Structures are given as structure tokens and as C-alpha cells.
A protein has these predicted regions:
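C-terminal cap/loop subdomain of S1 sulfatases and analogous C-terminal strand-loop tails that border
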Residues: 157, 162-163, 167-190, 344-370, ...
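Histidine-centered active-site microenvironments of extracellular/periplasmic hydrolases
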Residues: 55, 147-159, 291-294, 299-310, ...
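Transmembrane alpha-helices
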Residues: 8-20, 183-236
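Active-site segment of extracytoplasmic enzymes that catalyze sulfate/phosphate-ester chemistry
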Residues: 36-37, 44-135, 144-148, 156, ...
Length: 575
């Protein structure tokens, strides 16, 4: 009898020795699928599961009840491009170069040469090496080409996503007729300045203080500049509003009509054709970023105008994706995650005065700021086979934590040649740890370190210190309504020395800054965080910004074009 057992035992050992380790993963419990969803500019106060009583989000609320709700989930940056770079790489944007310079803090043109460097590793690229089918549906906003149109070095296909259907830039006001332009500050300020100069010039000429030739020359220059700016606004939709399938342009400019339904169907189709393999699907919604749009089925469905209608449509899409997992029998072993790239954009107001930004609930300020309203975002995680339903976790977590979490669960290896700032969430989600994976989180405004968050071990306190804060306008508001977003340059901020200190566990609205007279440990807390800053800065290797003027400005030879210049690059290859 013993000889009968030895043969299969030896055969099993022989198989282990002969087969590639990556080919025998099926001998272990199956690895989970991943469905990761990121809504654009969604405020934490827009969802029923986070306290909203007037918007209907039943599918998202159901997702929250079936898994874990993270109540202290932090975006690594308060703006689209840097936040998404950090999410994909698990690294602060200062490390990858995806940080702003001057008054520009996101990528603005498809024809720029900046983007997420190919040297960066995304969780998708590691999952792909582990045998996962990978796809990105929706918004990218991390660059496209480098040297020419045949060099898509920043394209999602080059950074781990085998399949891509979406927009390489972002949903701009310019992409939807009648919604104005995202370049309003960059263009209207020069126009207003020119108008003041012209009026002053004519007054001086009227009183004989300037010669006529000077007035004629300045007027001609103003006319040329005005014509150039008008032409620029005319071509922006053709330059920037592009829909792609992998490397091919399918619409230029894209139509928002039923676009969410189309992208939802793309997500469903991908899951259906990948159901027999492990897969990673990232759905980056174009909504609820402006220009706001929604299909006819949802128009007028909310009491919050077009913004609320768009939230309803996103919730419907989430429901379709979750129902597909149920239908395919994949819900149990699929990690589902939903978040926003940053807080709601409070300064978004339409030309008619309708509010086009969402709600950040009790949290101060919004998008473009490192106050809680700008970076505290929804964080919902469901893994039905492993995580019990109805949990709430109040410890600080970061959207950077998805990188090491995906790597761990896909049985990949974290890179050893770079700093990874994210921390795996597995132990916290499974109840095997009760502590935040982060003792410190660092909050940048472009390249400037603005704030630090400290979660001491064995304490419920969460301290947050600000070294400078934006100058809000109007003064008593919580936004920068004169510039549409808050900037980081010295002229737009107030420096604090000593720093502002808040205890977020007692003051989540950041309304009561503490000092030595109100916090006995003030000096100890400030010095502890100062030392953390010194240690953190020592780990930063200088890297040029991918948003420098040279990389940011559009270059004709990089402009994607699916027809010809004489046709304004227009095409519609799919209906």
C-alpha cells in the first residue's frame, strides 16, 4: 500500500518542480478580481451612506452596507491629475513628478508632453504581470504622447491597462456646448487687464498725453490678442475632447449623449469576456466633473438640478456593474472599491447661477484645498467572501493604499527600487488590525508641503497641522471664487508661523485652531510633526515636474487628430 501512495506524491512534487510558479497559482485559493470605481469631483456629503438625505444613491448605499465604509479616507492630493497618479502608483505625486507649477496644477492639453512617466509602476501593471486581465474605462488625465503621435508613452496601454475605452484628458466645460470654458481664469483675466489698459490709454490720448500712433498700435495688438483667444476657444473642443478605444480615436470631439451608458456597457462587456480569468477593472467616471451632463432618463430626476441628476446616473451605473458581478457569480470573490478623486468643487457655478458642485458635508472647503473638504473622500470596500457586512472604520487611510493592497491580494511583489507611501489595507479590512496603517500623512499643494496629519499609536486623536492656508475670497467663504480654484503660490496663501493645529477627532470641521493656551501638548505635537517632515523630505528624490511650461503647453506634432486639420480633426467612427 505504501508504494501506491509514493507514486502520486512523487508525481505531485515533480509537477511543482517542472511547472513555472506563476502557472500553479490555481493550487492555492483563487485570487480575487478587482472592480475599482472612482467618481470625479464627488463630495463625501453627496451620498446617502455618508449622511445625505436629499440625493438618491441606493446602489452605492447598498455597497456600503455590504462591506466596509471608511470614514477617514484621504485623497493624496486635492486635484485630479496628482490624486490619480498617487492612487495608481501608491506614491505621493512629488515622487512621480505629477505635481503642478505656478497657476497650473493639472494637465490641460492632449498635445502636451507631460504625464505619468512610464518608469512608474501602477497596480495594473503588476496585476497584469500576475496574469490578470486589466482594463480602464473612463477618464485618464495623466498624459498621452512624448515625442510624437506615434509615441504614446503616457497612454494607459503603456501603464498596465491592456484595454482602454475613455478619454485621455478630462471632461471639460469646453466639451459641452453652452457650458463655458475651463480656461476662464487664464483668458478672461488677460482680457480684463487689456480692457483696463486700453481705457486708460484712450483717456491719456484724450488729454493729449499720448501720441495717436501709440493708441493705434496698442489697439491693433489688443485686436490680434482677442482674435487669437477667440480662435483658441473655438478649437479647444477639437483639441481636448477626444474619446479613444485603446490607441484609436473613435470620436473627436466626443458626444456626451448617453456616454455614461456606453461606458457602463463597456465595463459590463469586459467583465463578461474576462469572467473565466482573474481581472482588474478600473472605472473612472467622467461625472460629476463639469461640464455636467446626463442622459434623458435621468434629466430632472433630482431636486439638485443637473448635478443631482448626474449623481443619480452614476449610482445607476454602479448598480449595473454590481448586478453584472451577481449575474456572473463573481460577487463573492471580487474586491469592489468606490471613491472620489478629491472633494466636491464648491466654486463650480454655472453662468445662470446654478450650483454645479457638490457637498462635502461637515468638512471645510473643497477641491484644490487640503482642508478636509478637499481631500476626505468616500471609501467603500466590499469583498463578500472575506469581509463581514456593515462595518465602519474610522482610522485614517489613503487612496494610495490601494496600490499595495492590490499587489498583496494579486500575489505580486512590491518594487524594492522606490519608496511606496501606501500601506496594505488587508489586515485592517479583515479585522486583524485596529490601527491606522499610517502614522503620518503628508498633504502637498503642488510641490509645497502644506499640511501634515498625525495618528499616534494607541490614541484616538488625529492631529493636523497647516503651514500655510489659501486666501479665500470672499473672505468669509470656504472657497476661492475669484480664481475658480485655490492656488499654492505665495501671493495666494497665508503662511502660519507657528503653524495652525487641529484635533480632527474633536474638530473634524477644522473650525477651532489650537494653541499653547488651549492644548497642553501643543509644542510636543508641533515638534513631533516637524521631525516627521524632516524625515519625509529626506526620502524625496528631486524630480522635475511633468507640468512644467515646456511639457504643459500644446505642441502641434503631438496633437491627436483622427481626420485632417482642414476638417478640424473631426470624426465619429462609432455610433
Amino acid at each position: 500500500m505504501r508504494s501506491l501512495w509514493v507514486f502520486p506524491q512523487n508525481l505531485f512534487l515533480l509537477l511543482i518542480l517542472v511547472l513555472d510558479p506563476n502557472q500553479i497559482w490555481c493550487l492555492d485559493p483563487p485570487r480575487p478580481n478587482f472592480v475599482l470605481m472612482m467618481v470625479d469631483d464627488l463630495g463625501i456629503g453627496d451620498l446617502g451612506c455618508y449622511g445625505n438625505k436629499t440625493l438618491k444613491t441606493p446602489h452605492i448605499d447598498s455597497l456600503a452596507s455590504q462591506g466596509v465604509k471608511l470614514t477617514h479616507h484621504i485623497a493624496a492630493a486635492p486635484l485630479c491629475s496628482p490624486s490619480r497618479a498617487a492612487f495608481l502608483t501608491g506614491r505621493y505625486p512629488i515622487r512621480s513628478g505629477v505635481y503642478g507649477t505656478g497657476l497650473t496644477m493639472v494637465f490641460l492639453f492632449n498635445a502636451g508632453s507631460g504625464g505619468l512617466p512610464q518608469s512608474e509602476l501602477t497596480f495594473a501593471s503588476i496585476a497584469q504581470k500576475q496574469g490578470y486581465e486589466t482594463a480602464l474605462i473612463g477618464k485618464w488625465h495623466l498624459g498621452l504622447n512624448c515625442e510624437n503621435r506615434s509615441d504614446p508613452c503616457h497612454h494607459p496601454n503603456k501603464l498596465g491597462f491592456k484595454y482602454f475605452f475613455g478619454i485621455p484628458l478630462t471632461n471639460l466645460r469646453d466639451c459641452h456646448p453652452g457650458h463655458g470654458t475651463v480656461f476662464q481664469f487664464h483668458i478672461y483675466l488677460p482680457i480684463k487687464t487689456f480692457a483696463v489698459v486700453l481705457i486708460s490709454t484712450f483717456i491719456l490720448y484724450y488729454f493729449g498725453l499720448l501720441p495717436r500712433v501709440f493708441v493705434i498700435g496698442l489697439s491693433s495688438l489688443a485686436a490680434m490678442v482677442t482674435c487669437f483667444l477667440a480662435a483658441f476657444l473655438l478649437v479647444v473642443p477639437y483639441m481636448n475632447c477626444i474619446l479613444m478605444r485603446n490607441g484609436e480615436i473613435v470620436e473627436q470631439p466626443f458626444s456626451t449623449m448617453n456616454l455614461t451608458q456606453r461606458m457602463t456597457q463597456e465595463a459590463v462587456d469586459f467583465m463578461e469576456r474576462s469572467a473565466e480569468k482573474p481581472f482588474l477593472l478600473l472605472v473612472n467616471f467622467l461625472q460629476v466633473h463639469t461640464a455636467l451632463f446626463t442622459s434623458a432618463d435621468f434629466r430632472g430626476s433630482s431636486s439638485h438640478g443637473l448635478y443631482g441628476d448626474a449623481v443619480h446616473e452614476v449610482d445607476w451605473s454602479v448598480g449595473q456593474i454590481l448586478q453584472t458581478l451577481d449575474r456572473l457569480g463573481l460577487s463573492g470573490n471580487t474586491v469592489v472599491y468606490l471613491t472620489s478623486d478629491q472633494g466636491a468643487h464648491l466654486e463650480e457655478v454655472s453662468a445662470t447661477g446654478e450650483r454645479h458642485g457638490g457637498s462635502n458635508g461637515i468638512y471645510k472647503a473643497g477641491k484644490s484645498t487640503n482642508f478636509e473638504g478637499g481631500i476626505r473622500v468616500p471609501g467603500l470596500v466590499r469583498w463578500s467572501e472575506k469581509i463581514p457586512p456593515g462595518l465602519e472604520l474610522h482610522k485614517p487611510t489613503s487612496n494610495m493604499d490601494l496600490f499595495p493592497t492590490v499587489v498583496q491580494l494579486s500575489r505580486g511583489q512590491l518594487p524594492q527600487d522606490r519608496v511606496i507611501d501606501g500601506r496594505p489595507l488587508v489586515d485592517l479590512l479583515l479585522g486583524e488590525s485596529q490601527s491606522s496603517p499610517h502614522e503620518f500623512l503628508f498633504h502637498y499643494c503642488s510641490a509645497r508641503l502644506q499640511a501634515v496629519r498625525w495618528s499616534p499609536q494607541h490614541s484616538d486623536s488625529v492631529w493636523k497641522v497647516f503651514y500655510f492656508t489659501p486666501n479665500f475670497y470672499p473672505v468669509n467663504s470656504s472657497g476661492c471664487y475669484h480664481t475658480h480654484v485655490c492656488f499654492c503660490s505665495p501671493n495666494y496663501v497665508t503662511t502660519h508661523n507657528p503653524p495652525l493645529l487641529y484635533d480632527l477627532s474633536l474638530d473634524p470641521s477644522e473650525s477651532r485652531p489650537l494653541g499653547p493656551d488651549t492644548e497642553p501638548d501643543y509644542h510636543h505635537i508641533i515638534e513631533t510633526m516637524a521631525q516627521a517632515v524632516r524625515d519625509h523630505r529626506a526620502s524625496i528624490k528631486p524630480r522635475d515636474s511633468e507640468m512644467s511650461v515646456g511639457k504643459l503647453l500644446p505642441k502641434p506634432w503631438l496633437q491627436p487628430c483622427c481626420s485632417s486639420i482642414t476638417q478640424f480633426c473631426q470624426c465619429q467612427r462609432e455610433t
